[in-house]
């Protein structure tokens, strides 16, 4: 399975010069708050997305006394390659795969898939539909190659439709050509999503069967395409929504409004589950997604788990550890206390482990 065999980081946030050789399986990263633990995970995510999972303001990633940061890694596995990303203060971004300029950030994501679980992932339960679309579209993007083009074209068509809706004099006949295109693209997008989300839901249910609290809670995932499913076709619903769309100035129906409803005993899961149970559900969602990805693509994503020991009891951490081990994934886990991190994160059979200490931006191997 693909894994980072070497990681070099320069002038990134508060990190000093980093040059480490991670374990292909489990990597425990510990240090005080503010020491740079999360920054190390953030640097790895930049290699996968050409952007941070913590901020959209790239200048915050560059050390004050420098003009650019650089992150470089050697990735080993069935398809070995080298990847590097540099971002300058001016905004110029350079990304390379095996010395050649990457065509896009999507190419980086395809070559180095990464799953991130941190405090922000609670948005899957607490937030709006946008967070859940981002979650399941990660899988759709990687598995269904036609999705990316269909989605990009769909977004362009909806933007054009929204622009027309804001005109003072507009009749539905002016929108019909755009709605025909939107309907065709929506059908492709929906088909891609259904083919990915259906096995995702099945995998999630199987995983939750291993969590004791789930015996007393009826957890349900339900995909919603972004329009009402029933007798009326999506194009007809677009036409009927014209008056409301015109009043609002934007399109209220379509794949850009799709969702994955997560309920417990018929109510929103966030209203029923404890914080620890919510974290367990979120973990299961990410593992289920990785399982489907592995089944379809034959690889596993790298997992970045920030402050994982918090809000999870030893039993749930043991379950998560087993799930990750069964996947064969490379994992980076951060925590404050080394002993606690090592004690609550059980070592699986035949699993190599490395511990890294981060202190004032310096990353060293811990014996």
UniProtKB/Swiss-Prot annotation:
Subcellular location, principal: cytoplasm
Coiled coil: none
Chaperone keyword on record: no
Swiss-Prot/TrEMBL GO biological process terms: DNA replication; DNA synthesis involved in DNA repair; double-strand break repair; SOS response
Binding locations of ATP: 31-38
UniProt KW keywords: ATP-binding, Cytoplasm, DNA damage, DNA repair, DNA replication, DNA-binding, Nucleotide-binding, SOS response
Database matches in Gene3D superfamilies: P-loop containing nucleotide triphosphate hydrolases, RecF/RecN/SMC, N-terminal domain
HAMAP family (UniProt xref): RecF
Biological role stated in the UniProt entry: The RecF protein is involved in DNA metabolism; it is required for DNA replication and normal SOS inducibility. RecF binds preferentially to single-stranded, linear DNA. It also seems to bind ATP.
Protein name: DNA replication and repair protein RecF
The encoding gene: recF
């Amino acid at each position: 399975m693909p894994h980072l065999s070497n990681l070099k980081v320069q002038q990134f946030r508060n990190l000093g010069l980093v040059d480490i050789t991670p374990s292909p399986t489990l990597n425990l990263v510990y240090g005080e708050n503010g020491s740079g633990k999360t920054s190390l995970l953030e640097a790895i995510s930049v290699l996968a997305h050409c952007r941070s999972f913590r901020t959209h303001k790239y200048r915050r990633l560059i050390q004050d006394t420098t003009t650019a940061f650089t992150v470089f890694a050697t990735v080993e596995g069935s398809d070995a390659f080298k990847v590097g990303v540099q971002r300058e203060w001016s905004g110029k971004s350079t990304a390379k795969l095996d010395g050649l300029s990457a065509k896009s950030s999507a190419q980086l994501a395809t070559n180095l898939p990464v799953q991130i679980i941190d405090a922000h992932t609670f948005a899957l339960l607490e937030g709006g539909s946008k967070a859940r679309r981002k979650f399941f579209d990660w899988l759709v993007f990687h598995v269904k190659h036609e999705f990316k083009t269909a989605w990009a074209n769909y977004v362009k068509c909806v933007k054009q439709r929204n622009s027309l809706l804001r005109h003072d004099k507009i009749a539905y006949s002016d929108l019909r050509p755009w709605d025909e295109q939107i309907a065709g693209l929506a059908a492709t997008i929906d088909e891609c999503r259904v083919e990915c989300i259906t096995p995702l839901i099945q995998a999630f249910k199987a995983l939750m069967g291993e969590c004791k609290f789930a015996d007393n809670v009826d957890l349900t995932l339900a995909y919603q395409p972004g329009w009402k499913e029933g007798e009326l076709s999506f194009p007809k619903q677009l036409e009927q929504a014209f008056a409301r769309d015109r009043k609002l100035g934007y399109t209220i129906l379509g794949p850009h409004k799709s969702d994955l409803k997560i309920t417990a005993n018929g109510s929103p899961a966030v209203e029923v589950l404890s914080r620890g149970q919510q974290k367990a559900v979120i973990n299961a969602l990410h593992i289920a997604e990785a399982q489907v990805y592995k089944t379809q693509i034959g690889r596993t994503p790298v997992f970045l788990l920030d402050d994982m020991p918090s809000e999870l009891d030893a039993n749930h951490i043991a379950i998560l550890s087993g799930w990750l081990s069964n996947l064969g994934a490379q994992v980076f886990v951060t925590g404050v206390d080394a002993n606690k991190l090592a004690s609550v994160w059980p070592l699986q059979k035949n699993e190599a482990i490395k511990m890294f200490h981060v202190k004032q931006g310096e990353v060293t191997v811990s014996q």
